[in-house]
A protein has these predicted regions:
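Membrane-embedded alpha-helical segments and adjacent helix-loop junctions characteristic
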Residues: 24, 28-130, 284-285, 289-358
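Transmembrane alpha-helix interface/packing and boundary motifs in multi-pass membrane proteins
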Residues: 13-20, 97-106, 145-155, 245-250, ...
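Hydrophobic transmembrane alpha-helices of multi-pass small-molecule transporters
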Residues: 1-55, 170, 181-310, 405-411, ...
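Hydrophobic alpha-helical transmembrane segments
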Residues: 5-9, 24-27, 88-96, 110, ...
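Alpha-helical transmembrane segments
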Residues: 51-61, 103-113, 182-198, 363-373
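Alpha-helical transmembrane segments of multi-pass membrane proteins
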Residues: 56, 87-100, 128-150, 177-185, ...
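Membrane-core helix-loop-helix motifs of multi-pass transport proteins
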Residues: 125-206, 364, 387-418
Length: 425
């Protein structure tokens, strides 16, 4: 068991320091599990590839296929037609649409589609004035926070959600949470977070929005041809089919296989070539997810997670048994760790410990997975944060300053919902 904890500590140091490439970290974690006698090679190999890993691979490929269709213009027209009556309503619409789509298709997909819309409407804003700078930040953060918040909403919103579902199925005797069950737990948190985020951003970036060109952008995208319309329509049908299948067949087929079916449809219909998918798929990330999931399984199987929980309980023995200290510690720990270590890897490695704290209470595992999606503090915490920072318009200091308030609010929202709403499910 202690060998698995040594590997866990080593992986954490290597990922946070980026001392070696991610694929090398993944392979090293796999090899060391065998060399240090954590488990036989066949056992390690079987835990390396499961539905959670297939989902990570399938969702990344599916995202590439969707972005390749150029749906950003089509989506912009829909948003403007619904929310275009005022600029602040439009920003609220950007956030809501980003969140809803991100909850089903993943934040890495939606930030790639939505960010060009935001950049287009702020291209003429003068960033040298405080009002103009705040307008730029308000638009960009509205999209970014929408995609980050939305990723907790459904199992397909993020790999960490699927990982936790697998862990709950493997390590507990509770009834398995399906696609709709996860939505019942997570979507109320998502909705409250959106409302809080809107007012947090309005407070953090006060601006008149004078130079934000919503109507000008509407005129620039007014023209489109019928061939593009047909392609977009067919793409939407494929997306709808996959989302419906996640709802109806997630237990029979698995989320990963369904995601891969979507990729196959796009390729078979000639809508995206394999070369594009192969070139843009981050295979190193897939390997790292697989390795950390495998390590997470072994941490539980070897009893390492039970040992950690026993040590934790000894440290907190002075607290009342019915206190929420354990829950708060686990939620804050996973939330903070994910801001430096990626949410999926955090859930893979700390998820077994969260479940072990209360094996018969899924709120501990669910809270850990959801809290790991609160990627508000650092620009390396999520694909959305990294893409936002890469624009050169958002500084690390600003991201942290606004994110600290949003992170604290999100932990409080999660606690209140789990305390008063989850108990009714």
């Amino acid at each position: 068991a202690y060998h698995s904890l040594i590997i866990l500590f080593m992986v954490f140091i290597l990922v946070t320091s980026e001392a070696i490439p991610f694929p090398a970290i993944a392979l090293l974690a796999l090899v060391l599990q065998v060399l240090l006698g954590v488990a036989p090679a066949d056992v390690i190999a079987s835990s390396f590839m499961n539905d959670a890993v297939l989902f990570v691979m399938g969702s990344l490929m599916f995202a590439i296929a969707i972005v390749h269709q150029g749906l950003d213009i089509r989506l912009a027209k829909i948003i403007i037609s619904i929310f275009g009556k005022s600029k602040r309503l439009f920003l609220a619409g950007l956030m809501v649409v980003s969140a809803v789509l991100s909850s089903f298709l993943g934040e890495h997909t939606i930030i790639a589609i939505m960010l060009p819309i935001g950049l287009a409407i702020i291209k003429n804003v003068d960033s040298s004035t405080p009002d103009g700078k705040n307008a730029i930040l308000l638009v960009l953060f509205s999209i970014a926070y929408g995609t980050i918040i939305g990723s907790i909403g459904t199992p397909s919103g993020g790999a960490r959600n699927v990982i936790m579902i697998n862990y709950l199925q493997e390590f507990t005797d509770t009834e398995r949470i399906d696609y709709w069950g996860w939505i019942q737990y997570a979507y109320p948190i998502l909705i409250i977070q959106l409302v809080v985020a809107y007012f947090v951003l309005q407070f953090a970036f006060p601006t008149s929005l004078d130079n934000v060109q919503v109507q000008g952008y509407k005129r620039s995208i007014a023209k489109s041809n019928s061939a593009t319309n047909i392609r977009h329509l067919f793409s939407c049908l494929i997306i709808g089919l996959i989302i419906t299948s996640w709802f109806l067949f997630n237990q029979e087929l698995g989320l990963g296989i369904i995601a891969l079916c979507g990729v196959l449809i796009f390729m078979i219909c000639g809508m995206v070539p394999w070369e594009v998918i192969n070139k843009n798929t981050n295979w190193g990330v897939i390997l790292l997810f697989a390795a950390t999931i495998s390590l997470g399984f072994q941490i539980n199987e070897t009893g390492a997670s039970s040992w950690l929980v026993e040590r934790f309980n000894e440290l907190t023995s002075s607290f009342p048994e019915d206190s929420s200290f354990s829950w708060s510690f686990m939620a804050i720990l996973t939330g903070l760790t994910s801001n430096f270590f990626t949410s999926s890897a955090t859930t893979s490695l700390l998820g077994p410990m969260a479940i072990e704290l209360q094996p018969n209470d899924i709120s501990f595992g669910m809270s850990a997975a959801i809290a790991s999606g609160f990627s508000f503090l650092t620009v390396v915490s999520s694909p959305t944060a990294m893409i936002l920072y890469s624009t050169g318009l958002v500084s690390i200091k600003i991201f942290f300053r606004v994110g600290l308030l949003m992170f604290s609010s999100s932990i409080l929202i999660l606690y209140l919902v789990s305390k008063f709403y989850w108990v009714t499910l």
